[in-house]
Structures are given as structure tokens and as C-alpha cells.
């Protein structure tokens, strides 16, 4: 049995939000259905035009049942947690926070569209793109894996990291799902070699060194404190980690630290900027630090305090994987 959270599709499109390079724990598990992990739970998400539909599995549920849960046949039991709240209301609130549903997205789309003709044309086919509020630890190490990589391979590496060092949560449809490992689990002396053997290459060293550095600074609490700093201060601290340059630091600031003005500039965004906004940058072979700053400042001036959100919509619109898979195109074919 599906639980429902009212949310129109124009406010959240799962395909773009879950599969657009923000988080690497989600996979398509059925028609209009995605399975992934956050908050020490396995989530199965779907949607109709008016609602997010969801099912949740936790390790405690499986231990209580002592068998595999048949999700499609068996409704979730309504239980209470230590605060006296029922799990259903807690999980509904977790979804609201994860998808930042407090932000009225349609209003911002209208505002950005009125300011920018290129955004307006992209937004027609790419409605409902949201910035996820991710766990900073997972976000940091996921994007260390992103260096010179594609979404499919990053996803594979992140899942390998979880299966090697994370705690089992639950088995769903024959697949075991794991929580993301805590920072301290990645500081062991054997971590780098083990990750190299698992195909992480030079990223293995970055993961181990960054884990050790984060623990020296105070662990996950230190990362959480970066939310209270200014965007520039938080980015400056992140760049001190191994394997974290300007783009990765901006991804972390945007996707897990709440600095929504952050603009990660990769080849996609460079091409979008040069083609549509900053023509004097066309034809450059590499994005210099000066160009990186210029592109970021241009979008911040154009879009304001949620510039990183608007930029993410343009990023999704430029991804080849979405060119033939937009809900708008599917409706037209039907």
C-alpha cells in the first residue's frame, strides 16, 4: 500500500530531481518508480499528477517480521517512535525536508522565466526540478567520486562504498540496501588499498585522506557547522579537503549545506553560459578560475539567492539522458 504526500508534479518531478546528478543512491525500479536510501531507510517513490507516493522499509521492520517484506502486497505497520510521533508522520516530514517542499517552486520558475528568455524555454519541458537537502557526509564523498566520471559510474562507486563500509538496512526485491558509512569508517589504514582494489583509482586516496581530515576537524559535526558559515567561508573550508576543488565544493555547498546561491560550473554549464549568456567565452578549451568565477557571478546576479537552484534546472535541460525522457515528450507521444 502506497502512502501519499500531496505535491503537484509541477512542484516536484522525481525523474529530473533523483536522476539529474545530485544524488547517486537512486535507481529506477519500475515504471514511474524509484528506489533509494536516505535517513537510514529504504524508500520506494512514485508519483501521480497530484501526489508523491511512497513506501518505506527500515532495518527494524525487517527484524521484527523476520522475513522479507512483500511491499506490493503488505501495508506498512503504523508504529510510534521514542518521541511519541507515529512513523508515518515522521517519514512524511523527512520527505518534505529532503525535497525542500517548503520552497514554492512554481513561483520561482515564474520569476526566473520573466527575467531570462533562455530559462523560460528550458523550463517548459523541465518543470519540478528540486534541490535535494542531502546528508553532508554522503554528499562530500559522493562528489569526491565524481572527479572525471559519469553519473552511472559514480552511482556504482557510491554503492560499492556503502556495501563495503555501510550498515545493512534492508533487502528489497532481492537487493540489499546499505546506509552510507560514517566518516570514521573510512579512516582505517586499509581503506585506500581496499578501494583501489574495488576500482576507485586515485579517488581512493582522496576518500581516505578527506575522511581523516574531517575527523581531525570534528567529524560530521564539523560538516554540519559549515551550514552556519557564509557560502564563501564554507567553500573555502571544503577546498582544504583532498579531491575537493571549486566545482566539487560548490556541489556540496548547494546540495547539502543549504548555500543555494552556489553555482557548480562543469562543461555543461560552461557551454550553456557561453552559448546563451557570455558569448565572449565561446571556444575556450578549459574553464579557468577567472571564467569559473565570472560564470558563477553572472548567474547569481541574474537569479538571486536561489541561483544554484535555477542553474540546476538549466543543467538538467542540457543532459543528453533527459532529451528523450521528459514527461512532456512522453505525453506528446501518447
Give residue ranges: language-model regions.
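HhH-family (HhH-GPD) DNA N-glycosylase catalytic core used in base-excision repair
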Residues: 1-334
Amino acid at each position: 500500500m502506497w502512502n501519499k504526500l500531496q505535491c503537484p508534479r509541477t512542484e516536484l518531478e522525481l525523474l529530473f530531481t533523483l536522476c539529474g546528478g545530485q544524488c547517486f543512491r537512486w535507481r529506477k525500479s519500475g515504471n514511474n518508480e524509484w528506489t533509494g536510501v536516505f535517513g537510514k531507510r529504504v524508500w520506494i517513490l512514485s508519483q501521480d499528477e497530484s501526489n508523491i507516493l511512497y513506501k518505506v522499509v527500515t532495518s527494524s521492520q525487517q527484524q521484527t517480521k523476520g522475513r522479507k517484506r512483500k511491499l506490493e502486497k503488505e501495508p506498512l505497520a503504523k508504529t510510534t517512535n521514542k518521541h511519541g510521533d507515529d512513523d508515518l508522520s515522521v517519514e512524511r516530514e523527512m520527505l518534505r525536508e529532503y525535497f525542500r517542499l517548503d520552497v514554492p517552486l512554481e513561483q520561482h520558475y515564474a520569476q526566473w522565466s520573466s527575467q531570462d528568455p533562455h530559462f523560460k524555454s528550458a523550463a517548459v519541458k523541465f518543470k519540478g526540478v528540486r534541490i535535494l537537502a542531502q546528508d553532508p557526509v554522503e554528499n562530500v564523498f559522493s562528489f569526491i567520486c565524481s572527479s572525471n566520471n559519469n553519473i552511472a559510474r559514480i552511482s556504482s562507486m557510491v554503492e560499492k562504498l556503502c556495501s563495503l563500509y555501510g550498515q545493512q538496512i534492508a533487502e528489497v526485491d532481492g537487493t540489499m540496501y546499505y546506509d552510507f558509512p560514517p566518516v570514521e569508517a573510512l579512516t582505517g589504514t586499509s581503506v585506500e588499498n581496499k578501494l583501489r582494489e574495488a576500482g576507485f583509482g586515485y579517488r581512493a586516496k582522496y576518500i581516505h585522506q578527506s575522511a581523516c581530515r574531517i575527523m581531525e576537524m570534528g567529524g560530521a559535526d564539523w560538516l554540519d557547522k559549515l551550514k552556519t558559515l557564509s557560502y564563501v567561508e564554507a567553500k573555502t573550508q571544503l577546498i582544504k579537503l583532498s579531491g575537493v576543488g571549486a566545482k566539487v565544493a560548490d556541489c556540496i555547498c548547494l546540495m547539502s549545506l543549504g548555500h543555494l546561491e552556489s553555482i557548480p560550473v562543469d562543461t555543461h554549464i560552461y557551454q550553456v553560459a557561453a552559448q546563451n549568456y557570455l558569448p565572449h567565452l565561446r571556444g575556450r578549451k578549459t574553464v579557468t578560475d577567472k571564467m569559473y568565477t565570472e560564470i558563477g557571478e553572472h548567474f547569481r546576479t541574474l537569479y538571486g539567492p536561489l541561483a544554484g537552484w535555477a542553474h540546476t534546472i538549466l543543467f538538467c535541460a542540457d543532459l543528453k539522458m533527459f532529451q528523450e525522457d521528459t514527461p512532456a515528450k512522453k505525453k506528446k507521444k501518447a
